[in-house]
A protein has these predicted regions:
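Conserved, well-structured functional cores that handle cations and Mg-NTP chemistry
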Residues: 1-224
């Protein structure tokens, strides 16, 4: 059963005002509070389902355009969220020495592949390679106070560099090995040559390991 969203949830109304100045107009702010309400009250939390359940919008693409086109800044909203939570929880948080920062890389698996930056990632829990996104996340824990801080999307080297495409372009007569060890050996053979291609070099420079992403999250957490 779908639950229609006729008004923002009371808890959203109570706290969302702290973010009001980050949006250019009332309509953007309404999309923001409607989306938060959908995340809290609906079982199916997909963007399309939340849009269907919002009754005050005749155009069900409005919410999608809010995320793809409206000029609000995601990083600014998240920064405000962190500062707001730290302010609200100051009386009950433990000292820094008694608090921890958790870094996690749990996969977010998908059934289909019609998503940006999706790939087969290694699941070190069961040894499989499901189709998934692989976010690296940071989570703050201080006694009873626990909330997420931020995330970075890990993208496999072959995906972010379009490696197979460049291999086929530069080595049209070579077959790319599928076995892990043979593929790693093939990388060592062809990658130095691919790096002479300026287009490949640009993509190569965008790659970040999970450790690098985790350090970025740690540095961000320290600033707070």
């Amino acid at each position: 059963m779908q639950l229609p969203i006729v008004a923002p949830a009371p808890i959203v109304t109570k706290h969302a005002e702290a973010f009001r100045d980050l949006f250019e107009n009332v309509r953007q702010y309404q999309h923001f509070v409607n989306y938060l309400t959908g995340l809290m009250v609906l079982t199916n939390k997909s963007l399309s389902n939340i849009a269907r359940c919002v009754l005050d919008s005749a155009d069900k693409t409005n919410l999608s355009r809010f995320f793809s086109q409206a000029p609000w800044v995601e990083a600014a909203v998240n920064e405000r969220r962190i500062c707001y939570l730290l302010e609200q929880t100051a009386p009950i948080r433990h000292s820094a020495n008694e608090s921890v920062l958790i870094i996690d890389d749990t996969l977010f698996e998908h059934v289909g592949s019609l998503f940006d930056h999706i790939a087969k990632h290694y699941n070190h829990g069961d040894g499989t390679y499901p189709i998934a996104h692989n976010p690296v996340t940071s989570h703050y824990v201080s006694g009873a106070v626990r909330f997420p801080l931020d995330l970075r999307l890990y993208r496999r080297y072959e995906e972010i560099t379009q490696w197979e495409t460049f291999v086929h372009e530069h080595f049209p007569d070579r077959t790319i090995p599928k076995q892990k060890k043979a593929r790693a050996k093939f990388h060592k053979e062809v990658d130095p040559i691919l790096l002479h291609d300026p287009k490949f070099q640009v993509l190569h420079d965008q790659f970040k390991t999970k450790i690098v992403l985790a350090i970025e999250l740690l540095d961000q957490a320290i600033t707070h």
